[in-house]
């Protein structure tokens, strides 16, 4: 059950800590909208990967089991056509190490080819040539 009133109150909160405190007071771990989205992704066999640059971070939706070139094609068809390789950081490694540079220095940035099956939460940079 999702309460529209509760979801509305959560949506109006700008501060992450305030939202978390509100959820705890309501006896919830996460909002109903988050649970709904997660359930829909699971039901539809979808997952998310990320791209990040100096000024932007984006989340992209793909099907579970998609390989790196297909993921690149979600961003732009030229990326899929001219796919060379992908640099990949696992989400948990990025959370623990905090920066791309720290992940690279710790050897946590992998270089993957056309057969790499993208994992949920991967942070990816694509190299391509068209």
Q: Model-found features: residue ranges?
A:
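C-terminal-of-GTPase-core extension/linker across diverse P-loop GTPases
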Residues: 1-119, 129-130
């Amino acid at each position: 059950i999702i309460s529209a009133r509760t979801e509305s109150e959560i949506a109006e909160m700008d501060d992450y800590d305030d939202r978390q405190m509100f959820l705890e007071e309501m006896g919830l771990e996460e909002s109903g909208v988050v649970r709904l989205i997660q359930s829909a992704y699971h039901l539809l066999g979808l997952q998310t990967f990320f791209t990040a640059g100096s000024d932007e971070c984006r989340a992209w939706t793909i099907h579970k089991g998609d390989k790196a070139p297909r993921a690149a094609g979600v961003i732009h068809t030229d990326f899929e056509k001219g796919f060379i390789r992908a640099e990949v950081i696992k989400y948990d490694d990025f959370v623990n190490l905090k920066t791309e540079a720290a992940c690279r220095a710790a050897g946590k940035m992998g270089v993957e080819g056309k057969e790499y099956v993208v994992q949920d939460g991967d942070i990816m940079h694509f190299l391509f040539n068209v």
